Structures are given as structure tokens and as C-alpha cells.
Amino acid sequence: MKKDIAFQFALAGSIMTIIFIIVVNSLSTTYPWFIYPTFALLLWPIGVFCAKKKNHKLLSIVYSLIIIAFLVTENYIQTPEYPWFLYALPPLLCWPVLAILDKHSKKVSTAILCSASIIGYYIMLNLILSPQHPWAIYPAFAVLWWPLALYHGKTRTFYAFSISGSLLVIAFFAAVNAITTPDHIWAVYPIFCILWWPLSMYYYGFKKKKIA
């Protein structure tokens, strides 16, 4: 019963506040600033309702749709000539997808499929919206850690993870160096630092066993 009262209070409070903000906005200025507090207020009753039902899947779906709608609105108001909201779609859509997949979301195959889809999406976006610079390598670098960490975490191959992770970092910095400033070789500095990761794993793990 208390949860019902909490939801009713959240719903009534949100509606009253949104109406008040819209009225104040219409009386003070022509700029629709009311959308910012309205966006936050809409999350309140929805969060309370989903918590009551213990339905995290519904929460992820509705929250993602509201955030996407907010970004589309903000994009249309501020810079309608450039659809920047498209950059935020993959992580926002991944949330409900992984929530719906439930236990299957922990599989390495799911991580590989989702990562490949996200990377492919950003490559396509890169080629269509801004082909001048291959910026897709940045989100690709971040996303590749997902299946990599999941696989080595499940197999408990931590030393192999340090090697494969180091190779990924080395490849990333080498690519960024070659693309942005090919006449100045600066990638050796972060590469030197990352090499300490597998080196320390080797001496701490394997050498420790030999000493024991």
C-alpha cells in the first residue's frame, strides 16, 4: 500500500510541477526551457512504478525512449542541421536489449555480436556524416574491451588478457598516431607504459609460482 501511495505522490507531484513550469516558461520567455526539468520529472514516477513492479526491463525500455526523445528534441531545437543525437543511440539501445536478453547478456557471443553491431553502426555513421576523419576507431576501441574482458574473465586467463589488452592498446595508439600526426611518433610513450601490464603479470604470477 505504501508503494501505491509513493507512486501516486510521484505522479501527482510530477504532473503539477510540469504544468507549473510550462506556465512559468510561457509567461517569461519564448525559449522552451521547460523541457529540461520536464525530462527529469518524467523519470520520477516511471522509476517508482517500475520499482514497485520489480520490472527492470520495462524501466530500461521506457527510460531509453524518454532519453532518446529528449535528445532528438534538443537536437532539433539547437542544431537541426546536424543530427548529433545519432551518436548516442547505440548505448541507449543496448540497455533495453541487454535487459531483455537477461542471462543471455552475459554470454561472450552476445558481447561479440553487440560489439560488432555497434562498431559497424559507428563506421557507417562516420562514413555518412563526417568522412574527413576516421573517428569510429575511438568508440570501436572502447567497445572491443567488452567481449575481450568478458571472455578472459570467464576463462580466468588473466595473463592472456593482459597480453591481448596490451596489443589492443598498442594497435589503437599506433593507429591514432599514424592518422593524426604521422610526422611525429608519440605513440611510443603510452605503448611503453602499457607494456608494464603483461610484464608485471608475468613476474607476479608465473615467477611467484617458481619461487614457491
Specify the residue positions occupied by each region the protein language model found:
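Alpha-helical membrane-embedding segments
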Residues: L65-T79, P96-L101, I119-S130, P147-H152, ...
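Membrane-helix interface and helix-disruption motif detector
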Residues: V23-T38, E74-P90, L125-A140, I179-Y189
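Alpha-helical transmembrane segments
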Residues: Q8-F20, I61-A69, L113-Y121, L167-A171
